[in-house]
């Protein structure tokens, strides 16, 4: 909206307004607007959800310390989605198809997560949608979008797999790229969902990964930098910086209320939608493998669950006291704030490692 207004109206009166069209300026405005919207509506949503008794449902087999969280409102992801959508609508070039691809995942996965949260509240149970139903809708949404993206760009570079540390090894996946992209979107969505188990644990790594993807989008949008690092030049990728900036701003505002002890939780409406959003951004940038590194904290959490289930079914014993792994550390007596901050540090380090791989390639 701001981009269109400047290009078509304000620039006619003075060339000074052209600064508004600059990507860096719009990214800053996107960040600030999402931050202040999140801060502005956060307290209102907390009060409203308190009055409606939209409280977090705590697992009966979880750590005993979590019983005090039962009076904490959930579904705070609505704040995140609203903040991101409004700021992106204001700051982004809405003629860019990538913006609408991301919106599609953000909103549809948000609706899916909202449905799951509402069912949990109605049932007064930690189980909302069945795993089968949730996975079906996640898959249908992701496959629909991925096929549209695949059909709209049939160039050779569109199905290349960029492998970290290897400069000239870019295998062509062809139609198999659809399944890779699908796996990245659905997998990231579920991985973030699994990681959202402690106050502020998931939102900070989400911001870190969004910042890393913003750097990659900036490089991909510059033909000289992209050529220098031997990664695809993607002319539409600039607007993804606006979206990533909005995610960071909205996340920072949400963290104001979500930090320990949390006043509100993001719920599935937040974790599923933001996880899927990070996944689709990585797909649009052709950096699926890089996301595995930068989002390594989410990968670790997911692997801990997979290993726990497989090992228990094979041997009848558990590797961890409880999965995901952050609960294991809780049950071992580690204070919740310490676990959270240490996971943040690990996540930040992995984002830096991911960005370094863009340069260290043979």
Swiss-Prot record:
Cellular component annotations (GO), alphabetically ordered: plasma membrane
GO MF: metal ion binding; phospho-N-acetylmuramoyl-pentapeptide-transferase activity; UDP-N-acetylmuramoyl-L-alanyl-D-glutamyl-meso-2,6-diaminopimelyl-D-alanyl-D-alanine:undecaprenyl-phosphate transferase activity
GO biological process: cell division; cell wall organization; peptidoglycan biosynthetic process; regulation of cell shape
Membrane topology: Multi-pass membrane protein
Documented EC number(s): 2.7.8.13
Chief location category: membrane
UniProt entry tagged with the keyword Transmembrane: yes
Transmembrane portions of the chain: 28-48, 72-92, 94-114, 131-151, 169-189, 200-220, 236-256, 264-284, 290-310, 339-359
PROSITE patterns: MRAY_1 (PS01347), MRAY_2 (PS01348)
Pathway(s) of this molecule: Cell wall biogenesis; peptidoglycan biosynthesis
Cofactor(s) listed: Mg(2+)
Keyword line: Cell cycle, Cell division, Cell inner membrane, Cell membrane, Cell shape, Cell wall biogenesis/degradation, Magnesium, Membrane, Metal-binding, Peptidoglycan synthesis, Transferase, Transmembrane, Transmembrane helix
Catalytic activity: UDP-N-acetyl-alpha-D-muramoyl-L-alanyl-gamma-D-glutamyl-meso-2,6-diaminopimeloyl-D-alanyl-D-alanine + di-trans,octa-cis-undecaprenyl phosphate = di-trans,octa-cis-undecaprenyl diphospho-N-acetyl-alpha-D-muramoyl-L-alanyl-D-glutamyl-meso-2,6-diaminopimeloyl-D-alanyl-D-alanine + UMP
Entry annotated with the keyword Ribosomal protein: no
Subcellular compartments: Cell inner membrane
PANTHER family xrefs: PHOSPHO-N-ACETYLMURAMOYL-PENTAPEPTIDE-TRANSFERASE, PHOSPHO-N-ACETYLMURAMOYL-PENTAPEPTIDE-TRANSFERASE HOMOLOG
Membership in a protein family: Belongs to the glycosyltransferase 4 family. MraY subfamily.
Free-text function comment from the UniProt entry: Catalyzes the initial step of the lipid cycle reactions in the biosynthesis of the cell wall peptidoglycan: transfers peptidoglycan precursor phospho-MurNAc-pentapeptide from UDP-MurNAc-pentapeptide onto the lipid carrier undecaprenyl phosphate, yielding undecaprenyl-pyrophosphoryl-MurNAc-pentapeptide, known as lipid I.
The protein's name in its UniProt record: Phospho-N-acetylmuramoyl-pentapeptide-transferase
Organism: Blochmanniella pennsylvanica (strain BPEN)
Taxon lineage: Bacteria, Pseudomonadati, Pseudomonadota, Gammaproteobacteria, Enterobacterales
């Amino acid at each position: 909206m701001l981009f269109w207004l400047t290009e078509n109206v304000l620039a006619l009166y003075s060339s000074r307004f052209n600064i508004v069209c600059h990507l860096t300026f719009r990214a800053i405005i996107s960040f600030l607007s999402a931050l202040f919207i999140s801060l502005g509506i956060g307290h209102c949503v907390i009060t409203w959800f308190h009055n409606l008794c939209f409280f977090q449902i705590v697992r009966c087999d979880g750590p005993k310390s979590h019983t005090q969280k039962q009076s904490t409102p959930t579904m705070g992801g609505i704040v995140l989605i609203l903040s991101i959508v409004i700021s992106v609508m204001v700051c982004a070039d809405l003629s860019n198809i990538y913006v609408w691809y991301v919106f599609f995942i953000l909103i549809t996965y948000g609706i899916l997560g909202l449905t799951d949260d509402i069912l949990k509240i109605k049932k007064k149970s930690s189980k909302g949608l069945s795993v089968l139903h949730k996975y079906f809708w996640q898959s249908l949404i992701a496959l629909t979008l991925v096929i549209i993206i695949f059909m709209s760009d049939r160039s050779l570079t569109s199905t290349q797999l960029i492998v970290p540390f290897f400069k000239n090894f870019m295998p062509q996946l062809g139609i198999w790229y659809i399944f890779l992209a699908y796996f990245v979107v659905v997998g990231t969505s579920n991985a973030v969902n699994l990681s959202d188990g402690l106050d502020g644990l998931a939102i900070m790594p989400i911001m870190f990964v969004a910042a890393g993807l913003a750097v990659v989008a900036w490089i991909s949008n510059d033909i000289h930098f992209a050529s220098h690092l031997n990664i695809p030049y993607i002319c539409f990728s600039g607007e993804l910086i606006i979206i990533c900036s909005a995610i960071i701003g909205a996340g920072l505002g949400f963290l104001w209320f979500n930090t320990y002890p949390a006043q509100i939780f993001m719920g599935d409406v937040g974790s599923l939608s933001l996880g899927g959003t990070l996944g689709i951004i990585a797909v649009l940038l052709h950096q699926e493998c890089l996301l595995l590194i930068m989002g390594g904290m989410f990968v670790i959490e997911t692997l801990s669950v997979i290993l726990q289930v497989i090992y228990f079914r094979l041997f009848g014993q558990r590797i961890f006291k409880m999965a995901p792994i952050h609960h294991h550390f809780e049950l071992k007596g580690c204070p919740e704030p310490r676990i959270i901050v240490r996971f943040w540090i690990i996540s930040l380090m992995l984002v830096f490692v991911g960005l370094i791989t863009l340069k260290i390639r043979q």
